Curated annotation (Swiss-Prot):
SUPFAM superfamilies: Nudix (SSF55811). This is Isopentenyl-diphosphate Delta-isomerase. One of its GO terms (cellular component) is cytoplasm. Binds 1 Mg(2+) ion per subunit. The magnesium ion binds only when substrate is bound. Binds 1 Mn(2+) ion per subunit. It comes from Escherichia coli O127:H6 (strain E2348/69 / EPEC). Mg(2+) binds at residue 87. PROSITE patterns: NUDIX (PS51462). Its main location: cytoplasm. The keyword Protein biosynthesis does not apply. Its EC number is 5.3.3.2. Keywords: Cytoplasm, Isomerase, Isoprene biosynthesis, Magnesium, Manganese, Metal-binding. Mn(2+) binds at residues 25, 32, 69, 114, 116. Pfam families: NUDIX (PF00293). Residues 30-164 form the Nudix hydrolase domain.
Length: 182
């Protein structure tokens, strides 16, 4: 895969430039555009993934299905589809927006900061997974209600963005409704 960049944003969310993805994520990460996606199978189960140990931020942490950064000239939906193919080897239905205004800043135990405007999407998988081990070290198909109970009981066991997304009342409602689309 070619070198990815992040789209830098000002405080109002207006693009101001780009920076190579690896260089962008430091102890003083600039605000940039990202996306987060929750994938469900035909049984209505949520795909929860464990980030590869080689990841710069939050290695080995359980999180929602797939996250990434749109590239210059790429729509969020195109970025979600691209990362699903790259990380999970899976085809999906058109991504649906479930939390368009999500923005967060969090610091991992190694001091790496995520500072993102990060719209959240959900989609159904339409093919079998072919996991890229460079991105994902483990995965499980889970009942959404069980995952949400786990997040409520042990938020430290999941990525901070997953916890923040799942504890937003409207996003939780939309995710729950999404499980009924099967």
């Amino acid at each position: 895969m070619q070198t990815e960049h992040v789209i830098l944003l000002n405080a109002q969310g207006v693009p101001t430039g780009t920076l190579e993805k690896y260089a962008a994520h430091t102890a003083d990460t600039l605000l940039h555009l990202a996306f987060s996606s929750w994938l469900f199978n035909a049984k209505g189960q949520l795909l929860v993934t464990r980030r590869a140990l080689s990841k710069k931020a939050w290695p080995g942490v359980w999180t929602n299905s797939v996250c990434g950064h749109p590239q210059l000239g790429e729509s969020n939906a195109e970025a979600v589809i691209r990362r699903c193919r790259y990380e999970l080897g899976v085809e999906i239905t058109p991504p649906e927006s479930i939390y368009p205004g999500f923005r967060y800043r969090a610091t991992d135990p190694n001091g790496i900061v995520e500072n993102e405007v990060c719209p959240v999407f959900a989609a159904l998988t339409t093919s079998a997974l072919q996991i890229n081990d460079d991105e994902v070290m483990d995965y499980q198909w889970c009942d959404l209600a069980a995952v949400l109970r786990g997040i409520d009981a042990t938020p430290w066991a999941f990525s901070p963005w997953m916890v923040m997304q799942a504890t937003n009342r409207e996003a939780r409602k939309r995710l729950s409704a999404f499980t009924q689309l099967k």
